[in-house]
Amino acid sequence: MTPPEGAKTELAKRVVVALDVRQNDHGDLVVTKGDQYDVREKCEVKGRGGVRNLGKPVALASRYYQEGADEIAFLNITSFRQGVLEDAPMLQVLEEASRSCFVPLTVGGGIRSYTDDESGKTYGALEVAATYFRAGADKVSIGSDAVYAAEDYQKSQGHLSSETSIEQISQVYGVQAVVISIDPKRVYVTSPDEAAAAGHVVVSCDDNVGPNGETFCWYQCTVKGGREERPICAVTVAKACQALGAGEIMLNCINADGQGTGFDLTLMKAVSDAVTIPVIASSGAGKAEHFSQVFTKTNVQAALAAGMFHREEVTIQEVKDHMKDENIPTRI
């Protein structure tokens, strides 16, 4: 239907579903979900619990497409341990999903240059991305490699080398094909001055006060699935990656991950205000209202959830119905 002449039109806000994919202890690919990035069940006795198994990747992706997801993101959360080109099961998942899911598919994990330990052959990030695109991906999500690229960009005072994975992939496939996944965590400070002097963007965090009553924090980026901290903040990484050629930011928050208490609105606002490319809010969604909150209080263009959909606590349709009731443009 054509809108009335002079009526304001807005882009629909997107509801994205994420599927964190990894091998379980039996070697099968399963969809799992972390609690602050820990994907293993809590174990009362000494030792590790098993990997949470929330279903098969292709079956879940097909279900979410039928239920109205605007996009689906496959995140290969252990890909830093091996090369993507040797990960035939993950590529097969992507190929099968692309035959039944006719919405944009994003795949992340291992988008980097690497050398195969057995053959000694080196593969470039562009070649890795091309393999994912041939398997059916519409976008690739770059994580750790993007943080390293942002650090180099900052050190070089804004020099474009044309050698980063972001630049190489966006130059061939377009900026819309490159998503940056940022995994930050809060670092609380008593005063903003010291962190700001180090180049970090410090924000007021009254909604998430620190353990000692701190009301300021900055968001420190991590790599390797949250296992290693880097001396750079999320806002700086987002701005650098936009300059390098990224077309979208998938913004996570380790503190909020798996908590179901809502997105970190302070983080989402800080980053979405700092860049002009779309930002996808991620981590913390537990009910439909959380989507409406992040869309009305920040400038994000999309919001992502995983666990609440996997466990069928909330449906995609319930989220979109709530958004419609709040006059937030969405695809029904």
Predicted segments with their positions:
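Conserved N-terminal beta1-alpha1 strand-loop-helix module at the mouth
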Residues: 2-101, 157-161, 168, 172-180, ...
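A cross-family glycoside hydrolase active-site/sugar-binding cleft signature
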Residues: 18-19, 75, 106-110, 143, ...
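Active-site-proximal loop/turn and secondary-structure-junction residues that shape catalytic pockets
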Residues: 21-23, 78-79, 111-113, 146-148, ...
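Short active-site-adjacent structural elements
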Residues: 25-27, 258-260, 288-292, 311-314
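Generic hydrophobic/aromatic pocket-lining and core-packing "Φ" positions
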Residues: 61, 94, 129, 166, ...
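Hydrophobic residues within beta-strands of alpha/beta enzymes
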Residues: 71-72, 132, 140, 145, ...
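Glycine/small-residue-rich loop that forms an oxyanion/phosphate-binding "nest" at active or ligand-binding sites
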Residues: 86-171, 325-326
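Catalytic cores of alpha/beta
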Residues: 101-139, 188-191, 266-303
